[in-house]
Structures are given as structure tokens and as C-alpha cells.
Design a protein with these regions (language model features):
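Core catalytic lobe of class I
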Residues: 1-207
Length: 207
């Protein structure tokens, strides 16, 4: 099968080059709100985010970051065709702000947006993604109730646009030639990824 690829190196806030309802599949992974490495990026999009972080208003910053992400999700919803699929890799964040440690559930906010905009959830994937270096817990982190569950998973959220599935020609040759073997189907469609390792991520910020 011959494929053609076109790359747009630009912000996804405005995908004006792509017609509405023209994309069958979107696979993406955004910056994760409340992960410190992305604070500067989110703050550049909305000055209120920087202020909220400086004032230790974690919940406010979290909600404002997702308001920015929602602009991208709105564009994704626009270009996705009815029955099309969007897959989003996103992890939750844990963070201590002004002596309060808590979880920021990014996957909940993303799911909330797509449900509000008429997409439906399909079974998602839990990506068991241990950190690349062993973590040492010392001091109060070894004592109840200060010891907390280690966050070592991310989500692959899967949504369909609308309740109707895409329609195909009966006995479509291309479709049936793409059928999975039984062993492949069981492995590739597992709802837990255990053997796919993540890689360290760095920002190349020029000062």
C-alpha cells in the first residue's frame, strides 16, 4: 500500500490547512499539565497560569492549563471525520505545592472535554511505564500515612467521534487484506502495556 505524508511544523491551535471532517485517525501526546518541565510553555500561553503557580494555587493552574489544551482538542474534534478515532497518550501528575502533595488527574480532564463535545469513550490502554532510574524513598516517605502509591502508569485514551461506526464497502479487499492473525490480535489489543519502555525526555531550551 502506497502512502503519502505531509508535515506541518506549527502549532495545533489552528490547523486551518486541514479541512473539517477529513481525518480518520489522530494519534497524539500533549504536554502534561502540572509536570514542571512544561510550566514555562503553559505560562507563555496564559499569564494567569504563571501567576497561579507563583501564588501556589495549584488547582487553578491545573484548570487553566487544560483550558489551553482544550483549544487543541477543539481543533482535533473539528478535523476528525464522523466515526473517526483519536488516541491520546497522557499521564497524570503528582506535585507538591506549598507543602501539599497531590495528584492532578489529567486523564479525567481530557475525558471530560471529549464527552462534553459529543465523542464517546472506547476501552483505553493502561501503559505501565516505570521510571528509567530507581527512586529512593527516604524520611517520612517510608512511614505511614506519608508513604503513597508510586505513580508508574500513563493512559492511552481512545475516543470515537459520534456513535456511528465508519462504513466500509462489503468485502473490501484492502480491509480484509489487513486482517490480524489471532496471536497478533491478542497481543496488540491488550488493555495493559507492560513491555514498552519509555525514554527520558528533555527540553532543548536556548537561553
Amino acid at each position: 500500500m502506497e502512502t503519502h505524508h505531509k508535515v506541518f511544523f506549527k502549532s495545533s491551535f489552528n490547523m486551518s490547512e486541514i479541512p473539517s471532517s477529513s481525518i480518520e485517525l489522530i494519534i497524539t501526546s500533549p504536554p502534561y499539565p502540572m509536570i514542571e518541565m512544561w510550566d514555562t510553555l503553559f505560562s507563555s500561553l496564559n499569564g494567569k497560569i504563571k501567576s497561579a503557580l507563583e501564588q501556589n494555587e495549584g488547582r487553578k493552574a491545573f484548570n487553566l492549563m487544560h483550558k489551553e489544551l482544550n483549544k487543541v482538542w477543539k481543533e482535533c474534534e473539528r478535523v476528525l471525520e464522523p466515526g473517526g478515532i483519536i488516541c491520546i497518550n497522557i499521564g497524570n501528575a503528582t506535585r507538591k505545592i506549598e507543602n501539599t502533595f497531590q495528584l492532578y488527574p489529567n486523564h479525567v480532564k481530557v475525558t471530560e472535554f471529549f464527552h462534553t463535545n459529543g465523542l464517546i469513550s472506547l476501552p483505553n490502554i493502561l501503559w505501565r511505564k516505570p521510571t528509567n532510574s530507581p527512586t529512593k524513598f527516604l524520611g517520612s516517605g517510608m512511614l505511614p500515612p506519608n508513604a503513597y502509591v508510586t505513580l508508574e502508569h500513563e493512559y492511552i485514551l481512545i475516543f470515537r467521534k459520534g456513535i456511528k461506526k465508519r462504513k466500509f464497502k462489503p468485502k473490501s479487499e484492502d480491509r480484509y487484506n489487513s486482517a490480524f492473525f489471532w496471536e497478533e490480535r491478542n497481543k496488540w489489543f491488550s488493555d495493559i502495556w507492560m513491555d514498552i519502555k519509555g525514554v527520558a525526555q528533555y527540553l532543548d531550551v536556548k537561553k
